[in-house]
Structure formats: C-alpha cells, structure tokens
C-alpha cells in the first residue's frame, strides 16, 4: 500500500513536530515524519532546527531549551513510543561529533521504535553503520543528484535500505533507485501526490495531509 506521510505532522494547522501535530496527522495519514535531536543531558526532543537562540540543541540541557522556546515541554520531549499514535519516520538530526552522545542517541531512538517505523538521516554513515542495531526499517535521505550513483550501488547490496528522496531528485533522468523503497519529499500539490503514488513508490511526504 502506498503511504501518505504527514511532514512534521500537519504544519499548516498546528505547530510542527509537536505531539499534537503528529497525532492529528495520524488520524488521516499513514505515517508521520518528525525530526529528532538529542540534548546535552541525553534527552530526545522533536525539533527541526539545529539551534535555538543561536545555541546548538546538543549543547543545551532539556531545562535550558524550555527557557528559549514557547513550545510546551510535553509537546517536544520524546520519552515513550506511546506518545505517537501510529507509524513514524524518525529523521535523526546529527549535529555533533561527540561519538559517545551519538551512540546514546542511536540506542535511545532504537528503543523507542516499532517494527513498522523508519529511522532515517542525511548522515548516511550513522544509518549504514547501525543497520544491525535498528529494530525497524531504516533509510538515507537524498537531496543531491550526485548522490544517486552511490545510493544505487548501496541499494544493490542492501535490499532493506529505504531512500527518502527530494522531489526534484526523484524526477531526475539519472534516478534508478527501486521505487518501492522510496519515499518522496516534500510534495504539496494533491494531483502531483497522486501521480507520484501511482508510480508505485513506498510513500510521499506532504504538508497537506489534511487537505487530500
């Protein structure tokens, strides 16, 4: 079945990446896509931007983050898989070279996933090096055409690897990835969404899940 992914929930109606936005999207979408980061005190937060008030998320504690945002802590602090009421694509935002913190990040998110979830990242190395650890699907993000050749080679070696592909790259004449393992992002025209789904991709990420 082809899937609709709510991009950070329903961002045109609710604050993106909040638990409320994600769960509202899951009432009408097959999946949600959300960004995950780790704090200095080893807590997971659902947040897209790498910084708050010019301070890296990874350099702030959870309590410090609450001082710089109006978002309620309960809406962004990810501690239990029960908080999200459906399938999720967790995009890992890796923004530190601290190996110990990254290892904790992987361990924590792995323990918070269901088998049908997806763990993905722009950091290919993190995904590829932890494939044996993940308890769910896993994928790499592609937003540059020059990544297509390498990702195609990897796809031949790993039949489980998924590909989260930026829309314009999906349309490239050099695109040869297995479509049934591709999730295309971010598509906000309803006709275009249906056209891409009809190409037998795994899914499409959209901001307009509530308008389809």
Residue ranges of each PLM-predicted region?
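Phosphate-group recognition and catalysis centered on beta-loop-alpha active-site segments
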Residues: 1-212
């Amino acid at each position: 079945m082809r899937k609709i992914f709510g991009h950070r929930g329903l961002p045109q109606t609710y604050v993106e990446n909040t638990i409320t936005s994600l769960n509202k999207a899951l009432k009408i979408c097959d999946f949600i896509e959300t960004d995950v980061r780790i704090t200095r005190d080893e807590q997971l937060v659902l947040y897209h931007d790498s910084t708050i008030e010019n301070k890296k998320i990874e350099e702030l504690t959870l309590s410090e983050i609450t001082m710089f945002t109006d978002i309620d802590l309960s809406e962004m602090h990810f501690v239990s898989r029960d908080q999200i009421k459906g399938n999720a694509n967790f995009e890992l935002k890796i923004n530190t070279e601290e190996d110990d913190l990254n290892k904790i990040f992987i361990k924590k998110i792995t323990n918070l996933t269901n088998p049908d979830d997806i763990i993905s990242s722009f950091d290919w190395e993190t995904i590829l090096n932890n494939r044996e650890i993940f308890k769910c699907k896993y994928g790499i993000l592609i937003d540059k055409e020059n990544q297509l050749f390498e990702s195609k080679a990897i796809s031949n070696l790993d039949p489980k690897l998924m590909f989260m592909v930026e829309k314009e790259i999906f349309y490239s004449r050099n695109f040869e990835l297995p479509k049934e393992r591709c999730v295309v992002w971010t598509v906000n025209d309803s006709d275009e969404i249906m056209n891409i789904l009809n190409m037998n991709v795994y899914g499409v990420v959209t901001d307009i899940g509530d308008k389809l």
